[in-house]
Amino acid sequence: MKGLCFLSAVPMRAEQSDRSEMVNQLLQGDTFEILEQQEKWSRIRCDYDGYEGWIDNKQWRVLGDEGQVTSDNRQQKPQETATASLLRAAGAPPTATADSPAEVAEHLYLGAPYLWGGRTVMGIDCSGLTQVCFKACDLRLLRNASQQATQGIAVASLDEAQRDDLCFFHNDQGRIIHVGIYLGDSRIIHASGMVRIDRLDTTGIYNEERHCYTHHLALLRRMPRKS
């Protein structure tokens, strides 16, 4: 069975409880497969990136074979995605795609607060930021930073980096824990406390307000453009 997110944003949780960690958000127009349905909660798999989690049964609708909502006496086509709504608000037609993920991040998300699992201007995490900005450019990324680090092609060094390349960062154990979008000129836009622009060098992200490195550079990847 397929479902549709008809609200602006719906939390996906690690467990079937409102107190459980929010691991992701569905945005309006997102579709998904129902893996397990209980009285109050359903476990789903997102069609876009395969991400799994639990959502409240009051916050989704059944999607019929022809793309129509079939429950709650509704008969309507899925509404436009939140990304399309944002692009339209920025002056682009609803069906338009942007040219640069970095531009989307700068123009639509700069200053948005950090929220673990978030994917909207009201709150967004590092890999949520990269995913929605690349989606606006018709480039598909997986949900987590560690997953995104397996996509695209490797960039050998920061000297060879181009605007819109993905920059990944590791913890002391070598695990990928953070991602941002390279802006060029040794600058990166990323979500850390808020969506912000910081300096980037071969060591990592340098926060000039705190006078320290906050993230250590691990690798860079480039997503090929669709022909």
Q: Where does each model-flagged region fall?
A:
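Beta-loop motif signature
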Residues: 5-28, 71-91
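Active-site nucleophilic cysteine motif
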Residues: 106, 121-137, 141
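...with weaker cross-activation on analogous glycine-rich loops/strands in unrelated enzymes
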Residues: 139-203
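SH3/SH3-like beta-barrel fold
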Residues: 29, 42-46, 188
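Generic structural signal for buried aliphatic residues
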Residues: 32, 84-85, 94, 164-167
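Short, basic/aromatic beta-hairpin or loop at an interaction surface
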Residues: 1-13, 132-148, 183
